Swiss-Prot record:
Notes on how activity is controlled: G-protein coupled receptor activity is regulated by lipids: phosphatidylinositol 4-phosphate increases HTR1A-mediated activity. Binding to aripiprazol drug is regulated by cholesterol, which shapes the ligand-binding pocket, determining the specificity for aripiprazol. Activated by IHCH-7179 small molecule: IHCH-7179 acts both as an agonist activator for HTR1A and as an antagonist inhibitor for HTR2A. Activated by SEP-363856 small molecule: IHCH-7179 acts both as an agonist activator for HTR1A and TAAR1.
Descriptive protein name: 5-hydroxytryptamine receptor 1A
Subcellular location: Cell membrane; Cell projection, Dendrite
Keyword Zinc set for record: no
Length: 422
């Protein structure tokens, strides 16, 4: 959003830079060629990478069937929105930045501001929609499977655009101050105090609060599940050390398949190990008592499960079996803790990037209209803040897609042109 225009917040005659206020009389001739070249290269690279990154995400979802699910539809819609920012908004913003003045006329300025606010607001609200979808998926996984439909995704996407439209249109209908159009060389968003509060809270502060709450609850739910798994693993290890093997869990088969199965149980004796018949336990060569049942699934496969013996305090499992279970329990505990660290890292990257890109911009956008006569915005700082917000459209596909292995595989296919051959 181009709330901070070249020249805003600075009425001095200091050397021109991207962010001096309206009323600034500097023209194209006052901007050095080196500034124009360097700025053009930097902003051109940012725009090119943003277009390429978001286009690849859209192409990956369109071409790879495994990526066509509700969660990725939201990511794809975010990529389309950021692609619109990159194609419709950033080129005009870059031209404005390089020339240090608006040269495209008032009508184009109004259209530019409306597109800017609409697309950037929709992009931010897409992040809320993704957070909401993830929150429902992790806190209500059973019921949400049936509710997580393309229709629901379409409703969330439509809502992001509706809110963006309601925030971007009012200035075109007159919710602005007369001073907003007083300088033909400047193109800024409405500085009306009421609209400033309405737009900044609707486009950023309320979505930010919502995302903090949602991701906070997602983290707590994920941590609860992970630590529950750790406790279960530790209990399993303790039971093994005290001579009790964990009973098979319902709805889980020996060979890892899920769902209900018909089982047939029979006792089998194995030479050199635990010798069992008709529920009686005999001592094996290693001195350990181990009852072994043979589990036959209706089909061809069979497995042998050690069960706790009822023949006194003799350990159920050989020492090697116990050590193996302890190693497995420790490995599972480490994996669970690693998942928790990964969850913290992922959520930190998502929220950290969003806040880093947009918070400085919206602080200035909220404060500046209320103290325009007394506030001074350094020109270079203003440019950095403005383009830091725009750069979120470049970083979104990296965070939400490129770290995903399924997307990585699809990108490799695109690069190798496998879809072309298909």
């Amino acid at each position: 959003m181009d709330v901070l225009s070249p020249g805003q917040g600075n009425n001095t005659t200091s050397p021109p830079a991207p962010f001096e206020t309206g009323g600034n009389t500097t023209g194209i001739s006052d901007v050095t060629v080196s500034y124009q070249v360097i700025t053009s290269l930097l902003l051109g690279t940012l725009i090119f990478c943003a277009v390429l990154g978001n286009a690849c995400v859209v192409a990956a979802i369109a071409l790879e069937r495994s990526l066509q699910n509700v969660a990725n539809y939201l990511i794809g819609s975010l990529a389309v929105t950021d692609l619109m920012v990159s194609v419709l908004v950033l080129p005009m913003a870059a031209l404005y930045q390089v020339l240090n003045k608006w040269t495209l006329g008032q009508v184009t300025c109004d259209l530019f501001i409306a597109l800017d606010v609409l697309c950037c607001t929709s992009s931010i609200l897409h992040l809320c929609a993704i957070a909401l979808d993830r929150y429902w998926a992790i806190t209500d996984p059973i019921d949400y499977v049936n509710k997580r439909t393309p229709r629901r995704a379409a409703a969330l996407i439509s809502l992001t655009w509706l809110i963006g439209f309601l925030i971007s249109i009012p200035p075109m209908l007159g919710w602005r101050t007369p001073e907003d159009r007083s300088d033909p060389d400047a193109c800024t968003i409405s500085k009306d105090h009421g609209y400033t509060i309405y737009s900044t809270f609707g486009a950023f502060y309320i979505p930010l609060l919502l995302m903090l709450v949602l991701y906070g609850r997602i983290f707590r739910a994920a941590r609860f599940r992970i630590r529950k798994t750790v406790k279960k693993v530790e209990k399993t290890g303790a039971d093994t050390r005290h001579g009790a093997s964990p009973a098979p869990q319902p709805k889980k088969s020996v060979n890892g398949e899920s769902g209900s199965r018909n089982w047939r149980l029979g006792v089998e004796s194995k030479a050199g190990g635990a010798l069992c018949a008709n529920g009686a336990v005999r001592q094996g060569d290693d001195g350990a008592a181990l009852e072994v049942i043979e589990v036959h699934r209706v089909g061809n496969s069979k497995e042998h499960l050690p069960l706790p013996s009822e023949a006194g305090p003799t350990p159920c499992a050989p020492a090697s079996f116990e050590r193996k279970n302890e190693r497995n329990a420790e490995a599972k505990r480490k994996m669970a803790l690693a998942r928790e660290r990964k969850t913290v890292k992922t959520l930190g990257i998502i929220m950290g990037t969003f806040i880093l890109c947009w918070l400085p911009f919206f602080i200035v956008a909220l404060v500046l209209p209320f103290c325009e006569s007394s506030c001074h915005m350094p020109t270079l700082l203003g440019a950095i803040i403005n383009w830091l917000g725009y750069s979120n459209s470049l970083l979104n596909p990296v965070i939400y897609a490129y770290f995903n292995k399924d997307f990585q595989n699809a990108f490799k296919k695109i690069i190798k042109c496998k879809f072309c051959r298909q």
